[in-house]
């Protein structure tokens, strides 16, 4: 009786874990379909990096402290670069 109960509970636990993993994969695949292609994301990342570093360099040339430009959308300026938060 105990062995059967343990087997049933083990199967139930495996089923729950498998279902959860499948749902996560499905959600990730939907996000990938809706989002931008990787090449466009790379271009956006490079643009943010360039934008942030150039703005800091311009401010340094004017003998002012570098007031880092705020990066938007989960990014912040650090070491003259936009980094993902």
Swiss-Prot record:
Disulfide-linked positions: 52-66, 56-77, 71-82
Propeptide: 23-48
Main subcellular localisation: secreted
Lineage: Eukaryota, Metazoa, Ecdysozoa, Arthropoda, Chelicerata
Stated role: Neurotoxin active on both insects and mammals.
A Pfam family assignment: Toxin_20
Molecular function per GO: toxin activity
Keywords of this entry: Disulfide bond, Neurotoxin, Postsynaptic neurotoxin, Secreted, Signal, Toxin
Classification via InterPro entries: Hwtx-2-like
Protein name: U4-theraphotoxin-Hhn1a
N-terminal signal peptide: 1-22
Family of this protein: Belongs to the neurotoxin 12 (Hwtx-2) family. 02 (Hwtx-2) subfamily.
Subunit structure: Monomer.
Species whose genome carries this gene: Cyriopagopus hainanus
Subcellular location: Secreted
One GO CC annotation: host cell postsynaptic membrane
Summary of the tissues where the protein is detected: Expressed by the venom gland.
């Amino acid at each position: 009786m105990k062995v059967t109960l343990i087997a049933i509970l083990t199967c139930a636990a495996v089923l729950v874990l498998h279902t959860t993993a499948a749902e996560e994969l499905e959600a990730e695949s939907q996000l990938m379909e809706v989002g931008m292609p990787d090449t466009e994301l790379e271009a956006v990342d490079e643009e943010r990096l360039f934008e942030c570093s150039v703005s800091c360099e311009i401010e340094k040339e004017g003998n002012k402290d570098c007031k880092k430009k705020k990066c938007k959308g989960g990014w912040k300026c650090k070491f003259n670069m936009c980094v993902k938060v």
